[in-house]
């Protein structure tokens, strides 16, 4: 039974397709259930009632979520799913003896607002901050398992953030170093004359890769920051047009050179193919390509709006076939064990593993059936997105 069906049972109406609306309505229904029939109603709500409501929400909501909500007369409640798939960070600030707290998906928010970084909200944990500044927390799941989404480190997070004790910047440096070692093993006579990143999330890995290989690092593309993510746009023509507007090449960095282009990942392949075309149009004599992430071949069901499987460039293709599609001399993907090692950090974290489902098809929450995946894909394919955008 999906959350929408469960909320109809609770006599709650969902007005949008937002998963946040559904999740918080589920939590609100559990809060209401806690005080039903109790003298005083919501005024009699106790701290233990809130923790129990979060516990029941965990049992009823499968998947990934980090939630922050307000309860009238009480204060703020923040909670994270039992696998900690999505990040949730807490900062603290003291003003004349009053303790302020801030919650956000990334630690960098604390620096921007002048708060001290406190800690990550743990998997399955709920945090209550009262109006008077008092604070309490409890892990509201009997068996939380910490498996955050590895794609946060690859692409989504800002490099100056720290996620679950691991520096995003440091993780991307290690991704670049791992790629460099692969190149040295598999292409010892690579002939690379310049390493060029795809801005912005490919930059840090490209810098470290260039340093490890002893090859010049060059900024060959200028990014238009007013164009959104192309891999989630509906329709091939729209994506191709957006790629043209999103990046512009600097010809002197390509003319007559053998260049290695480094990007964080390859999804549909449209951006990669157009970038390779731009490098060749700018005069590159050879173009190689490296991805900080392994091939994406499985749907993400934990909050990332990725395409249907048959729209991934890696779906049903070998590396050689992908190389031909994007038009490069050779193509190198990060290997999953190397990516996991890069994101685990320097051994100063209690993380054991990550959710890597878009790479290996192993969904950490369990219960993801082919029927469910087919339903998700029917809502994400190009035809569905074009219909929704009309």
Residue locations for each model-derived region?
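Flexible loop/turn segments at secondary-structure boundaries
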Residues: 76, 85-87, 110-112, 135-136, ...
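Extended, hydrophobic alpha-helical segments in both membrane/secreted and soluble proteins
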Residues: 195, 202-209, 213, 217, ...
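PRPP-dependent phosphoribosyltransferase catalytic core
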Residues: 57-58, 73-75, 80, 99, ...
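Short internal beta-strands
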Residues: 15, 221, 288-291
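Conserved short alpha-helical segments that host acidic/polar catalytic motifs at enzyme active sites
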Residues: 4-123, 128-193, 198, 286
């Amino acid at each position: 039974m999906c959350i929408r069906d469960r909320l109809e049972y609770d006599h709650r109406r969902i007005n949008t397709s937002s998963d946040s609306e559904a999740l918080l309505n589920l939590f609100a229904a559990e809060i209401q259930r806690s005080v039903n029939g109790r003298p005083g109603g919501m005024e009699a709500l106790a701290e233990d009632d809130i923790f129990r409501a979060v516990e029941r929400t965990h049992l009823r909501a499968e998947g990934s979520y980090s939630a922050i909500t307000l309860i009238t007369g009480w204060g703020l409640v923040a909670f994270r799913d039992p696998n900690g798939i999505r990040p949730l960070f807490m900062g603290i600030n003291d003003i004349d003896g009053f303790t302020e707290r801030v919650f956000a998906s990334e630690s960098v928010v604390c620096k921007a607002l002048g708060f001290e970084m406190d800690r990550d909200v743990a998997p399955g944990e709920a945090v209550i901050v009262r109006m008077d500044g008092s604070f309490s927390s409890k892990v509201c799941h009997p068996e939380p398992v910490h498996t955050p989404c590895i794609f946060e480190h690859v692409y989504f997070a800002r490099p100056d953030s720290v996620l679950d004790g691991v520096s995003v910047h440091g993780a991307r440096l290690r991704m670049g170093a791992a790629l460099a070692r692969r190149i040295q093993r598999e292409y010892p006579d690579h002939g690379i004359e310049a390493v060029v990143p795809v801005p912005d999330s490919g930059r840090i890995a490209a810098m470290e890769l260039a340093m490890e290989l002893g090859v010049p690092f060059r900024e060959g593309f200028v990014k238009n920051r007013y164009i959104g993510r192309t891999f989630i746009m509906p329709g091939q023509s729209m994506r191709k047009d957006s790629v043209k507007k999103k990046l512009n090449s600097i010809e002197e960095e390509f003319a007559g050179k053998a260049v290695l282009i480094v990007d964080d990942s390859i999804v549909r392949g449209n951006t990669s193919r157009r970038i390779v075309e731009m490098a060749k149009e700018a005069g590159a004599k050879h173009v190689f390509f490296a991805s900080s992430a392994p091939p994406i071949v499985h749907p993400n069901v934990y909050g990332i709006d990725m395409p249907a499987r048959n729209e991934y460039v890696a779906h049903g293709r070998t590396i050689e076939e992908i190389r031909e599609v994007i038009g490069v001399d050779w193509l190198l993907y990060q290997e999953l064990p190397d990516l996991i090692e890069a994101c685990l950090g320097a051994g100063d974290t209690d993380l054991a593993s990550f959710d890597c489902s878009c790479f290996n098809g192993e969904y950490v929450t369990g219960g993801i059936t082919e029927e469910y995946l087919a339903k998700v894909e029917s809502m994400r394919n190009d035809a569905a997105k074009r219909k929704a955008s009309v």
